[in-house]
Amino acid sequence: MPLPLPNLDDRRWEDLVEEGRALIPLYGPDWTDHNLHDPGITIMELLAWVTEMDIYWLNRVPDAHRRKFLAMAGVTPRPPQPAWTVLHLRLKAGATAQHLPAGVHFEAARSEAASPSTVPFRTLAPLAAIPGEVQTLQLKQGDRFTDLTARLLRGEALALWGDDPQPGAELYIGLSDPPPVETPVTLYAVLEGEHATWAARARLIEEAARRAGLCRPQFGCADEPGEEPPVDVPLPPHHSVALSWEYLSAGGRWHPLAVTDDTRAFTLSGSIVLTLPAAPGMSRAVIGAAPEPAYYLRCRLRRGSYDAAPVLRHLLLNGVAAEQAAAAGVTIWLIAPGANLPADPPQPGTDDTLNFSLDASGAIADLRREPNAPALRVLAFEPPDGGPGRLALAVETLGEGDGRPHQQIAGAWPQVAGESLRVFTREGDAWRVWEQRPDFDAAGRADAHFVLDARTGEITFGDGERGRTVPPGVPILAAYDSTLASGGALKPNRVFHLPDSPTNRALLAEVAAIAASLEIVTNPVPASGGAEAETVDQAAGRALAELQKPTRAVTAADYEALAFETPGVTLARVGVRPNLHPGFPCWDAPGVVTVIILPHLPAGRPEPSCETIRQVAAYLARRRIVGTRIEVVGPTYRTVAVQASVRACQGERPAALRERLIARLDAFFDPLIGGPEGGGWPFGRDVYRSEVLQLLDETPGVEHVISLELLGDDCEPGCGNVCIGPVELVD
């Protein structure tokens, strides 16, 4: 609960006037006329009005101070966030494979009249678009094939490996056209659930980076610690499940495939990139329940167990993730004939550290590479050939410096995506790189700092005392990604096209030819996630929510919440037992906390794998209190049988009633949906005869219960309750 803000001064205008009038005899005894018509009283009332305004501001906290308070809590207002979607490219029949690097722009027209008229998206990964599509999708469990093609084409959510995945299950993916050899084939899987999102992926990588940072060797002298470089770690594989990918060749033989799986064994939305060898080639065949022949890929669930069954929404050939952002601005410099050029010319579509000197006409007279120059995207480079050449960089010219304190300038696009803004000035023949800071409080006279207003896109430079000013006449340039933020949201199945933009011309050799080979480009999933720049009030609300989340395991509720938050693990229930060791349940164990975890699988009797237990234990170990021992275990199941005789209502069939009673008992004792409150049978809760008796008696079709006995592990029937251990569930 937030503390109430105190009223530092509750005096009003009338109080101030009366206080001043009461002090007149003390400071001005000769002043005897205190009526309203006196000019002195009029001046006093005016000053009281000014003082009341000062008191009003005294009780208010300005946004600048609130930002400082939020920064002390580790929270800063978020910049504009771009929307995100998946693009599905389909090539025309007979087209050849098209290689698209990351960063290619696609545009969708707005359905409503708005500015701008198109919404640009850029791809986040390279893609080799090939002809064909996913023709069939089949699941093989044992000797039985299940055709999932119709549900996949309708966009329905389907359990990819069934409701209870088991090792040995096989997925058969039939392609309509043979993929080219030695060419990356991309399948994009869109999965459902909060544990399959980009946020879940980011948490996985963040936790892996933290663990890698703990294990890094320390280099350098002890008296010169310096700043360690950030840890760059890839997406960790699934902690339990291992998949094998194969393709079918002539003669019905299956051959292994080289695979880069970015879905973490179908637990995250992402791409699966497969590369076919030159030999043997793929063969077309009819397999399983699908009547049409296809070129088949096979994915086998080789070992391990899932915490929850993966739910697939889309499986796209030539699918690629895209975000609603685009590089803003292009600046072109002419290259004078006879200019000095590097032996290795700049390549369009790459980032290069270029510097140059200009002649009197403003054309480049000397182009060179310098390691300290900023890395900028080269959009075009044309050396002089009988006339001036041309160099185009993905940087926007904002204007020129005027030398004044707190100069403000803005780009053509007010919404800057994320933390992409970089600001430079050209001072003589050198680049000066400016650093973005939240304010100028720590800036000195020589510090090249600037402040960005994320809501308006305005850039503010220093005043000469705190932060440098921009010298007069110096060009100011900026490289950044623009976004429409929440305006980039699109409904699914919108049609995109490949524009002839400067970025695409730099990345693609033949933009028109590639655009002509595309039959259609759509987004099967809606573009979502875009957000405007966060206000101070919104950041304060987020700070309150984040501060309420546990970051250290102190109470039982903290252990439970942190166990649920373990990256890469999907749990259905968590139980916490302080002062209990699972190996000695009848004894108090001070300092020991037992955490019982329960995934969603296997169906009917879920229990975690050893790998899942290790993941949760490692996550909790870094957040425990010193001196606390954590034991992470799965539940132990105790078999409880019910022997009962009931009298059926008139006209009720005994066999149907028996099945109904068994179903109700199974649901009541179910570890996920059972128990008195329907949230799963509580850990360590005894089975009470009275509750079972009530359950049987309330079953439709039962007139009354004649007899009831409960049987425990000893198989001896009894008329009392059945005791359950602290880490046990009912089977």
Language-model features: locations:
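Signature of Asx- and small-polar-rich beta-strand/turn repeats characteristic
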Residues: 1-731
